[in-house]
Structure formats: structure tokens, C-alpha cells
Amino acid sequence: MEDQGIIDLFFERSEQAITETDKKYGGYCYAIAYNILSSREDSEESVSDTYLTAWNTIPPRKPNIFSAFLGKITRHISIDRWRKQSAQKRGGKGVTGLATKEEDFVQDV
């Protein structure tokens, strides 16, 4: 199916839009996600989240280049997921520890 036909299905709110998108661009989106995440499960979740985001975004928005639109969504979702996982590996505390020390410093002055 052509991209315009898939986009029309999104505008009609037909679930067939997701099926056709997966047939045509599932491998493309998965490759983007896997190159970032290096995990089959996380990549599959990112692709599913991509379809959900496309479903919620396309009507009223109409992408000019559907593959680029999906690729950008997949990339952003995958990077966000990677950042969350990286933060958890570091303990997930991040700036919180610094804020506590800063508060101690301000109280001492």
C-alpha cells in the first residue's frame, strides 16, 4: 500500500492503518530502535509506542514523508527509553544528591 493510502486510513481512524504501517515500515522502525537500544524487547516496545504516537498525532497532522515521520518518532522514543535505562543503571539519583548538598551549603552561609 502507498504511503498516502496508509495516511488516509489514519484519518479514517481505521485500525488497518497500524497493520499496513507495520507491514511496510515495521522492519525499518525496528532497525532504528535496535541500533539505539540493542535489546529485542525494548526495540519492540519502542516500535509499538511509535505506532501509538503516530495514531495520536496524524489526524490533524499530515506528514509529508511518512517514513521520515515514523523514523523520527522511533528515534526519539528509543533515545528516551535508553536515557531512562542509563539513569537507572547509575542509581537514578542524578541531580537529587547535588540539590541536598547545595541546600546544606546555603544553610551554612
Residue map of PLM features:
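Acidic, Ser/Thr- and Pro/Gly-rich low-complexity regulatory segments
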Residues: M1-Q4
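Alpha-helix N-cap and coil->helix boundary residues
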Residues: E20, E41-S46, I65, F69, ...
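Sigma70-family region 2
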Residues: F11-E12, S38, S48-F66, Q85-S86
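Arg/Lys-rich amphipathic alpha helix in sigma70-family domain 2
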Residues: R75-K93
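Internal acidic/polar
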Residues: Q88-V109
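Residue-level preference for hydrophobic side chains embedded in well-ordered alpha helices
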Residues: T21, Y25, C29, T50, ...
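Short, charged helix-capping/linker segments at alpha-helix termini
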Residues: F11-E20, Y30-D49
